[in-house]
Amino acid sequence: MCRKDAYAPFREHVTALSAKATAPLTATGRLWGERTLDTSGGLPDIAIVDWKAPFRWLAGGWRDLWKAPVPCLTYGLLLAIVSFGIAFALIASDAEFWALALTCGFVFVAPMIAMGLYQAGRSIERGEKPTLGEMLFVRDALRGDLAYLGLFLLLIYLLWGRIAQIVYGLSTYQLHRTVDDFVTFALTTSDGNTMLVTGTLAGGLIAFLTYCGVVVAAPMLLDRNTGVFTAIATSVRAVAENFWPMLLWAAILGVLTLASAATGFIALIVVFPWLGLASWRAYRDLVPGPLQE
């Protein structure tokens, strides 16, 4: 009498997963070719995009901005006013270093601040006119999973502030109270150069890891009734499957955001809504599917 193999179903499942994991992927499909799909069980499909995709997202975001200029630019104006007020308060308190550090760390919390712009992008895609009220008070933003993502980004932001403080404290025993003094120290002394390199590398690494987890997750949680871990996993997969286009997109977001802050936050009035709407386009391109109600 033959003995039944209790592990046969498990082995068959593992064999099927292994065959799927080792299926060939072409470089053409990843970087230069037409838009294709990569599927994984239990997670949404991920589209493979080419290196030109970030520029298409920017162009689409710019068009969307001028389909609803009043609410979108007002949203950007409110952000610029709040950002300027915080920076002014820190500078007036002789904490200019913190103003610089927190401005650089703005990229960590930007995905949650842009939630109203994702809502505007969704409305525009549906053929509706977004209003400032629905952008400021996004109904779906009250969901627990979005709150968890916001808490995660806030903790990352605070972690960045602590790391910046440690790097600065280990680099000098003096307190540079003005921006001019700090810039002079950073650019003209060996300790300042070391601080600049160390802080840039540490901040860049944290920023990129955070970007991988939230670039798709934030708009996805607004659009779909899914869990925060599923959204983060989908975001990481989107970056992994489109590494070079997404690296370019990260550079565009970072450079334009920080350059806007360098104008005294004035450029944020236009740039932030533009990038927020473009980010919605990026999500819809990377995670295709019908809009959720």
Predicted segment positions?
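Hydrophobic alpha-helical membrane segments
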Residues: 1-293
